[in-house]
């Protein structure tokens, strides 16, 4: 088991790149701590924003992802001059301060819980964001499960290769467009001030405690559930 830690402060920007599965948990600390049992190695370091390049993970000759890393522009904040970058060739776990802002890339699965900043996540297979404050951008090649407090943008699009479960707790005024295995449907919550497009290779489940109104031309609604009682 390889382990590394670095002093990061209470609200760091952390970029995590893993060749396989990655689990991320928020905790009460000013350290970013990572561990992996894989043979692909582990690196953790502070980098200037001008140094951050491509996120690339591969298994053999098969490239899982190869994308340019653009640092997110956090609302009300300047782009940080330094970021913490964690890289591992295989699977592992990363602990980050509760207030972290994250960009996470993984060749297979991503599981993030208990983060009070913004999270952007790109998974080759499954993606799960639970008890996250702010949802940025997200995509997955397989199943996606989202449970966040708010979103960073007013117009968003999320795509999953399989089932997509979507719950944003403060979504009280939005126009929802969904395309999944059952076809296309459109609905409105409140005054429809935000725009949310959900595209899935499986079934989409919209989780909300708000009234959902079906819209023309078909006045069809898909799968809608109320959140579980806390």
Which residues make up each language-model segment?
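Intrinsically disordered, low-complexity terminal regions
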Residues: 1-230
């Amino acid at each position: 088991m390889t382990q590394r830690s670095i002093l990061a402060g209470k609200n760091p920007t952390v970029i995590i790149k893993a060749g396989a599965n990655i689990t991320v948990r928020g905790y009460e600390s000013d350290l970013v701590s990572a561990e992996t049992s894989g043979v692909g190695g582990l690196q953790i370091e502070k980098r200037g924003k001008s140094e951050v390049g491509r996120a690339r993970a591969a298994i053999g000759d098969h490239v899982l992802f190869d994308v340019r890393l653009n640092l997110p522009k956090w609302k009300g904040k300047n782009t940080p001059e330094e970021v913490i970058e964690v890289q591992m060739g295989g699977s592992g776990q990363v602990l980050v301060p509760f207030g972290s802002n994250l960009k996470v890339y993984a060749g297979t699965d991503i599981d993030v819980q208990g983060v009070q900043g913004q999270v952007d996540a790109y998974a080759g297979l499954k993606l799960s964001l639970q008890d996250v404050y702010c949802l940025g951008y997200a995509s997955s090649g397989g199943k996606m499960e989202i449970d966040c407090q708010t979103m960073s943008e007013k117009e968003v699009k999320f795509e999953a290769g399989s089932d997509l479960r979507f719950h944003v707790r403060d979504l009280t005024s939005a126009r929802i467009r969904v395309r999944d295995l059952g076809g296309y449907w459109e609905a409105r919550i409140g005054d429809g001030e935000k725009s949310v497009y959900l595209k899935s290779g499986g079934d989409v489940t919209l989780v909300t405690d708000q009234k959902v109104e079906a819209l023309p031309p078909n006045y069809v609604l898909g799968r809608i559930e109320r959140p579980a009682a806390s």
